[in-house]
Amino acid sequence: MERRYLKNPFPDFAGGENTPFASDEEHIKNLICTYVDAILEHCHPNSDDEDNRGDLYVGNAGIAFMFWKLNSCEQTRDLYPALDHAASFIRNAKVNANRYKKRSAERYSFLCGNAGIYAVSAAISQALKETEELSDDLANFKSGIPCSKEFMHTKYGCDEVLVGRAGYLSGCYWLNDVLPEKKITDDDLVSICQLIVTSGREYSKQNNSPCPLMYQYHGTEYLGAAHGLCAILHMLLDSPWFRTLPISAPAAELRDIKRSIDFFLELQDSDGNFPVALEDLRSGRDKRLVHWCHGAPGAVYVLAKAYLIFKEEKYLASLRRCADMVWKKGFLRKGPGICHGVAGNGYVFLLLFRLTNEMRYLYRAHKFMELLTNAEFKLRARTPDRPHSLYEGVAGTVCYLVDLLEPEQAYFPFMDVFH
């Protein structure tokens, strides 16, 4: 395991919880400019060299989202003509999206499909006040609603975040947050959630799972955020069922969702981490990754949402164990990105800071930023396959740095537990 991460070179926070923490905003802005300049140098929106798909995960839509975020932050809005760049990158992504329009699954595939492209385009069109383009973007995005309601079990799975229904829900929630009027109705959101619950129940029953709701992706019962249980449960908790008190979820749905969260919670090990997949427990294979996609850095979002809804201290205690483990083992050699890199792990501390207002977590978040320019990290870190992309590369790192400038509003892309 030690090969996967660098030893943390920083002392932990030594001040009291009310000790003010001074942020070096100019250093953060300079680092943002370093990464954005590299993106503009190496990524050209009208070229297919960098990406042939255009999606949010590693394509032009992800870079467009980064520029949209730069424009959304008062402190970074004037660093670049961000909306112009966002429009250029999303335009190319939509050209690529046209090739896949006839595939129904593409219409609700968010991080790795057409739905994410049109969602980001809608936000950009809104910012540019392009009403006709916004209308077209929303129509294309909402074409995923009927497709996502088709009940199906495939050998690949269709409920997770990257390409499935949970990811589509995350896009619906995000659009409803960033657009001035709610565009996706509660009825549509609830019907998708109901189908996800039904799917999880049926799979669990068919496979004698110990968890009331269980899902698979390519035959593996993943537990992490990218393909697995914890992010699916998070998106169910974000639904209208849990938006107000008293909770409006039907009793059976509430029972199965809560029991599934508590089942997942019990899988946390003494270090504070979680298994990659349920099969690891059955086989005795001890594979523990410290990534957003697999492990505690992605699990924190469902735990935080559960804490906010159910007010049970066990969820906060679990979150603190996650954060302490990430502080020890989260300086990954896999690069600076948010899926399986330093910035994604740094987001754990921004989440805990928003949740607790404790300065130790903001301090830790800043130390993860400092690691990006650490000599050992620059020497030993690997270069991702898509080094400038949103999830694997520095476009996601830029989003993390922007959030360091406004930590009270920080959120991992499309996973805001406070919305």
From Swiss-Prot:
UniProt xrefs under CDD domains: euk_LANCL
InterPro entries given in the database record: 6hp_glycosidase-like_sf, LANC-like, LanC-like_prot_euk
One GO BP: carbohydrate metabolic process
GO cellular component, one term: plasma membrane
Disulfides per UniProt: none
Pfam family, one: LANC_like
SUPFAM superfamilies: LanC-like
Entry similarity comment: Belongs to the LanC-like protein family.
Protein name: LanC-like protein 3 homolog
